[in-house]
Swiss-Prot record:
It comes from Lachancea thermotolerans (strain ATCC 56472 / CBS 6340 / NRRL Y-8284). This is Adenylosuccinate synthetase. GO terms for cellular component: cytoplasm. Its cofactor is Mg(2+). PROSITE patterns: ADENYLOSUCCIN_SYN_1, ADENYLOSUCCIN_SYN_2.
Length: 434
């Protein structure tokens, strides 16, 4: 059994909370894409665990965890995150953590060039705005991967004669390319190589052939949960390009990032915030640059885990969700942070876009078009009561249930879970038939 949790909007939907809820039922939790540019917090028995690169299944003592080939890995950050988790009580984490030998390495020079590249991309964009990178070196690493000049984990841990010398040569070539590209790019390559020579031995026990690992698990009928990073609207192909991340964050990235054929995937859970947020620049049709937007931001505590940046806030955009559903094929949805809407008398929901009076059939790929659309809203009545203590779906206010039913009917996918508050246990389960 392979089930997948994916973000359906622009990230920060609350995927970690659903994974936290589900992880006790699984034998393996795997990451398929991204790096340490995403983040979420899981609370277990009052202890907060911050995850960025490592799979959340580490909180389950019976769960193995895999960083897949589609992930790009900054080794110092990997060990720093692991040590923080160990310090908080996950003392056996190393025994249950594995890394694909095919995962690409993020070096410090990738992070250095990230900001330089950001400035160039902002100059090339249609509106002159920054892309909004986290500065973690993710984009430059995927660029070296695509140009077939990157270094993978197996290059680092290979102990065959001459392997380290080959690694060093390729590494220095990558640094030299950046020095030629950016002119005054000063960088201590010797120091980083010395660090990686040390990491080489430390990393070896974690490294596996992830294709063999995953397919052996499937053969043995293990229960596998794939933990998505970022979200569909940040996908390099299907997101609001170029205001996206550098990997495939949708269902396609799950297959390529773990070496899985599509037929082995059973359930795809789409996580949807009850309103919409995004971090950084890029079009955002339902954004509310007004009192409503500020209210959503303040009540929802909309600040990024990884960057601390304020999230832009707006109403739920069902055009985005329907588009996301077409691509990812969600079998059920988790609506999160419904309680943030508790005090709103009326709640507008975006249901269609028009351009110069003409209705668009689907979410547009052209940002020049997207930036000019008018959003048509349906305004639904609020419930104006506190739902944070509610534990049963039937006990939700009628208008809250109508809001959820409107979403289900619009996208044609059942809602299985509803987040009713920030607490770990504040999740209402709704029986669905599939």
């Amino acid at each position: 059994m392979v089930n997948v949790v994916l973000g359906s909007q622009w990230g920060d939907e609350g995927k970690g909370k659903l994974v936290d809820l589900l992880v006790g039922k699984y034998d393996i939790v795997a990451r398929a894409a991204g790096g340490n540019n995403a983040g979420h917090t899981i609370v277990v028995k009052g202890v907060k665990y911050d995850f960025h690169m490592l799979p959340s299944g580490l909180v389950n003592p019976n769960c193995q965890n895999l960083i897949g080939n589609g992930v790009v890995m900054h080794v110092p950050s990997f060990f720093a995150e692991l040590e923080q988790l160990e310090a908080k009580g996950l003392t056996d984490a190393r025994e249950r953590l594995f890394i694909s030998s095919r995962a690409h390495l993020v070096f410090d020079f990738h992070q250095r060039t990230d900001k330089l590249r950001e400035a160039e991309l902002s100059g090339a964009s249609t509106d002159g705005k920054n892309i909004g990178t986290t500065g973690k070196g993710i984009g430059p690493t995927y660029a070296t991967k695509a140009s077939r000049s990157g270094l993978r984990v197996h290059h680092l841990v290979n102990d065959e004669p001459g392997a380290w010398e080959e690694f060093e040569t390729k590494y220095r070539r990558l640094v030299q390319t950046r020095q030629q590209r950016y002119g005054d790019f000063e960088y201590d390559a010797d120091a980083e190589l010395a660090r990686y020579k040390k990491y080489r031995e430390e990393l070896k026990p974690f490294v596996v052939d992830s294709v063999v690992f995953m397919h052996n698990a499937i053969r043995d009928n293990k229960k596998i949960l794939v933990e998505g990073a970022n979200a569909l609207m940040l996908d390099i192909d299907f997101g609001t390009y170029p205001y996206v991340t550098s990997s495939n964050t949708g269902i396609g990235g799950v297959c390529t990032g773990l070496g899985l054929p599509p037929r082995v995937i059973d359930e795809v859970y789409g996580v949807v915030k009850a309103y919409t947020t995004r971090v950084g620049e890029g079009p955002f049709p339902t954004e509310q640059l007004n009192e409503s937007g500020e209210k959503l931001q303040n009540i929802g505590a909309e600040f990024g885990v990884t960057t601390g940046r304020k999230r832009r806030c707006g109403w739920l955009d069902l055009v985005v969700l329907k588009y996301s559903t077409l691509i990812n094929g969600y079998t059920s949805l988790n609506i999160t942070k419904l309680d943030v809407l508790d005090t709103f008398k009326e709640i507008p929901v975006g249901v269609s876009y028009t351009l110069r009076g003409k209705k668009l059939d689907l979410f547009p790929e052209d940002l020049n078009v997207l930036g000019k659309v008018d959003v048509e809203y349906v305004t639904l009545p609020g419930w104006e009561q506190d739902i944070t203590k509610i534990t049963e779906y039937e006990d939700l206010p009628e208008n809250a249930k109508k809001y959820l039913k409107f979403i289900e009917d619009f996208v044609g996918v059942p809602i299985e879970w509803v987040g009713t508050g920030p607490a770990r246990e504040s999740m209402v389960y709704k029986q669905v038939s599939k």
